[in-house]
Amino acid sequence: MPTQEAGLKLSGKYAIFVDYSHCAIAPLTLYLNYMETAYFNGKLLPRENITISPDDRGFLFADGVYEVTRWYEGFFYDMNSHQTRLKRSLRELRINWSDADLFPSVANELIKINKLENQHAMVYLQVTRGASRRSHSFPKPEVTPTAYSYAWGFTPDTKAMESGIKVMLKEDIRWSRCDIKSIALLPNTLSFQEACENGLKECIFVRNGVITEGSHSNIFFVIDGTLYTHPESNHILSGVTRKNILRIAEGEGIRIREEAVQENRIRFVKEAFISNTSSEVTPVIELGGNTLGDGVPGPVTKMIQNKFNLEIKALKG
């Protein structure tokens, strides 16, 4: 529970107002109220009443997975893919959470009970292996996983999506299972913090001379009219937005190559953009100090942005 100095006093309780506009990929303002209702181990509870064991392996080892999905004023975008990815991450970490199929219904209930139906919102779910005496080996017998989920409303700032962003390049110091949506994100946060402190909006990783992805985004390039992105592998997260961008691009007849781009080919890049659940499609106009194209969002990027937005509007009905 934050102290009075850390938050706003509301009816004797405390809330936190967080503005990430100085460094977020797509600047957004969110409001986390500790009087909101969250999901915890099968129950809906006020956030302030939730307690987690200090022996939880998520706390001790970052032994867990997470998923984030976006609510568009009436629906979740491609919830099925988020559900599939969640189950895969759980399998890869050998966490047996019996309620994994409930994620969509839990997410919908959190939106409803927190009265977020008519605005943009996000739902975060985290599942750890559970609480047990500290040991590098898995608990024997198995313990019940710890599941926590909450929702919050936000107002996207479209400036970055319209004007483009500048990003840095950095050697990829993460582990070799980036395909798992693990809560072990310290290399990502350290790298993103460095980008923020340098006035940049994202950190793009380079592994052995190959550009892989961002600290919390996938990245695409346009070279000679062809759309490039790193192929699915253990070095990138299979982004839900990434998958849908590839589908949209194919439908528009854009040439696609799921092929790694070498750092030394940046001089040939005419356009680039990043993608994730919260920032959708955000143009990159400067990469590692190199201005891309004319320094403004390019035609392929804007086409994909437009088609993505039209799809969202169509789903709203």
Annotated model-derived regions:
Residues Y31-C203, R207-V210, S233, L246-G317:
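Conserved alpha/beta cores of soluble small-molecule-handling proteins
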Residues I236-G239:
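Short, contiguous acidic and Ser/Thr-rich linear segments
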Residues V210-E232:
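Glycine- and Gly-Pro-enriched alpha-helical subdomains that act as flexible
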